[in-house]
Amino acid sequence: MERAGATTLKGNPLTLVGPELKAGDAAPDFSLVDNGLKPVTLKDTGTQVRIISVVPSLDTPVCDAQTKRFNEEAAKLPDLSIITVSMDLPFAQKRWCNDFQVDKVKMLSDHKDGSFGANYGTLIKELRIESRAIFVVDRDNKVVHAEYVKEVADHPNYESALAAARSAASAKASE
């Protein structure tokens, strides 16, 4: 499935590969690689509420800021897991985390086969990088929040994602 013009980069329309997920959808599986080159699937990410922050490349200003922001938020949200996904090589992700003391988010790379991007609808066909997006996945592996940022160079709505994650964590905790 391709979604022509679903995103733009500096105003230029681009095609996203994969479905457009919405709240209520089952979170699709994926196969990503951690910075130790080990495969990681959805099941491996645990049963906590997860914020999945998707960025094109850590070496760009907005991606850098987005990942640092979620690293700061992770310190205040001990019962949540925050994952950053990009097409950067695991070695580059590890270097970037070390350079900027980012140690509270789990970095995962989709460079190997792009399965995350294809399954979550974030793979930019023309560039073979991820688009900017945020997903919140609850303990039952249901998507409770999905934001595809229309202009790749723009920031996502951090507060909306954080509110959805807090709500999912407290709703489940009170059952």
Indicate residue ranges for each PLM-predicted region.
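Chalcogenol-based redox active-site neighborhoods
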Residues: 1-175
